[in-house]
Curated annotation (Swiss-Prot):
GO cellular component, one term: cytosol
Disulfide bond entries: none
Classification lineage: Bacteria, Pseudomonadati, Pseudomonadota, Betaproteobacteria, Nitrosomonadales
EC supergroup of this enzyme: transferase
Function: Catalyzes the formation of 6,7-dimethyl-8-ribityllumazine by condensation of 5-amino-6-(D-ribitylamino)uracil with 3,4-dihydroxy-2-butanone 4-phosphate. This is the penultimate step in the biosynthesis of riboflavin.
Species: Thiobacillus denitrificans (strain ATCC 25259 / T1)
GO molecular function (one): 6,7-dimethyl-8-ribityllumazine synthase activity
UniProt keyword Transferase present: yes
Signal peptide per UniProt: none
Pfam families recorded: DMRL_synthase (PF00885)
Protein name: 6,7-dimethyl-8-ribityllumazine synthase
GO BP annotations listed: riboflavin biosynthetic process
Source domain of life: Bacteria
The family this protein is said to belong to: Belongs to the DMRL synthase family.
């Protein structure tokens, strides 16, 4: 990335070799989550993350992500974590609670532990929107995890 000044800038590194990645995936909206996971795994492979360096943990839903992610982050076994899930709007206020609180919890875990977490919990109005977004969001989560793990090693 070029800048117009003489300030040194760290370019992103997308090399996953040797990185240990933890993934927490919801069982709720399972077909969407499996689509996200498939795209994420494919991208992790492409970035050089070895399958034996990836651990997948299933949780019931999006509100359970922060606790599982916190425990994984505190273990010091992972360079980065990925949250995979899908919250589809229904007819009640529950959507807002789950969406907001899971996101807040994930951010809190990152800041508390210093372990980067790529948030690939889709929050959508319809299942169709989720299916349209899941492949790119899954790939993006893998890239974010690898980029942030490498960045934090350099800071």
């Amino acid at each position: 990335m070029g800048t117009s000044s003489d300030i040194f800038e760290l370019d992103p590194i997308y090399q996953g070799k040797g990185l240990r990645i933890g993934i927490v995936m919801s069982r709720f909206n399972k077909d969407i989550c499996e689509g996200l996971l498939s795209a994420c795994e494919t991208e992790l492979d492409r970035l050089g993350v070895a399958r034996e360096d990836v651990l997948l943990v299933d949780v019931p839903g999006a509100l359970e992500h922060p606790l599982a992610l916190q425990k994984m982050a505190q273990s010091a076994r992972y360079d980065a974590l990925i949250a995979i899930g899908a919250v589809v709007r229904g007819d009640t206020y529950h959507f807002e609670i789950v969406s907001n609180e899971s996101s807040r919890g994930i951010l809190d875990v990152q800041l508390e532990t210093g372990v980067p977490i790529a948030n690939a919990i889709l929050t959508v109005d319809t299942e169709e929107q989720a299916h349209v977004r899941m492949a790119e969001k899954g790939r993006d989560a893998a890239r974010v995890a690898v980029e942030m793990a490498n960045l934090l090693k350099r800071l």
